Regions:
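Short glycine-centered segments of the SAM/dcSAM-binding site in methyltransferase folds
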Residues: 87, 153, 177, 237-238, ...
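C-terminal capping/lid region of NAD(P)-dependent oxidoreductase domains
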Residues: 2, 291-295, 306-328
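Glycine-rich phosphate-binding loop and adjacent beta-alpha segment
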Residues: 95, 224-291, 325-328
Length: 328
């Protein structure tokens, strides 16, 4: 038996209950991982609330969580790439999420396909990489699209959240000038400390502020400001849509396309093991150089999963939210 956070129906955070569940039999291509940290993501919030229904005929009981960092404690008979004691990170690929092909990461132990894991070297702080985690992989995809480097100025919306704060840190690690947009004035100083060269406060319900001209936009918000983000792009600029916390229905002037701008998007649903290992390798390389630091993280015990979901919903913190199974 192992402890896990279980959801038995859609609704408020209080429906997340800590229960004892059976350990599944390990398949030949799987490893059993003792979870050190499980990231809490907006995806988990939307699924629990019923906004993003689980894509199974009988979705409950359901264990949330789309990313984990932990240590291998058992290996299947066919696994040749990992050993007991190895530190690994895994995310998406049917773990939790709407696909729910296997139980999610909100538990003490999780069974994962070895091919879905990225091995972590001994010099990497496991809690730092857990904090960067899926947010860092997502932000990296955004910069791959819009471009990074000393000749780039990139605007990041939703900069105070999990992915946004990682995008600010990652952009600076890649040598990019960063404009951070947040709706919460209380987060401005923290964003500057993360490396933002300029912070724009755009409170909800108020007229959008004047945005500076940028070469790229990493958009995590969507909604009413989207058209203004497009206008902020210099000729030939690029916008990457990574999430729509303010809604995915947007409008913009089509004439902007005549200035050579391009728009695209990325979803972590496209991740596979090879892509994960490549992204994690790039992120940990920056960590070793000392150029990429983990953003702040609020940490909760498994039993406090409801409080962790409330923390994400309230959006009062900056950075990420983690569940730590070993915290009593």
């Amino acid at each position: 038996m192992r402890r896990a956070v279980v959801l038995n129906g859609y609704g408020p955070p209080e429906l997340l209950r800590l229960e004892k569940v059976r350990r599944p039999t390990l398949r030949a291509d799987e490893v059993r991982v003792r979870v050190l940290a499980a990231g809490v993501n907006r995806t988990d919030i939307e699924i629990r609330a019923g906004n993003w229904p689980i894509q199974k005929p009988q979705p409950f009981p359901y264990i949330p969580g789309v990313e984990v960092v932990g240590r291998v404690i058992e290996i299947g008979g066919g696994v040749k790439t990992l050993r007991q004691g190895d530190a690994v990170i895994s995310m998406m690929m049917g773990m939790g999420g709407v696909r729910a092909e296997r139980p999610g990461g909100y538990q003490e132990e999780v069974a994962l396909r070895a091919a879905d894991c990225a091995l972590l070297s001994v010099d990497i702080d496991l809690f730092d990489i857990a904090t960067i985690g899926l947010a860092g992989v997502t932000a990296l995809a955004g910069f791959d699209f819009v471009g990074a480097g000393p000749d780039r100025r990139v605007l990041v919306t939703g900069a105070g959240g999990g992915v946004g704060s990682c995008a600010v840190s990652l952009g600076k690690a890649l040598g990019t000038s960063i404009v951070a947009v947040t709706r919460d004035r209380r987060k401005a100083d923290a964003l500057a400390r993360l490396g933002a060269d300029e912070v724009v406060v755009a409170p909800p319900g108020e007229a959008p502020p004047q945005l500076p001209v940028v070469t790229g936009v990493v958009d995590l918000v969507g909604g009413a400001m989207f058209g203004q983000l497009v206008k902020a792009l210099s000729p030939g600029g690029k916008l990457c849509f990574l999430g729509g916390t303010a809604g995915d229905a947007v409008s913009f002037s089509a004439s902007s396309l005549m200035e050579g701008i391009s728009m695209g998007g990325w979803s972590s649903e496209v991740l596979d093991g090879a892509a994960l290992r490549s992204a994690v390798g790039r992120l940990t390389s920056l960590m070793r150089r000392g150029t990429l630091s983990a953003p702040p993280a609020a940490k909760f015990a498994l039993a406090d999963a409801p409080a962790a979901h409330h923390a994400v919903q309230r959006d009062e913190h900056i950075g990420r939210v983690l569940l730590l199974p070993d915290v009593p």
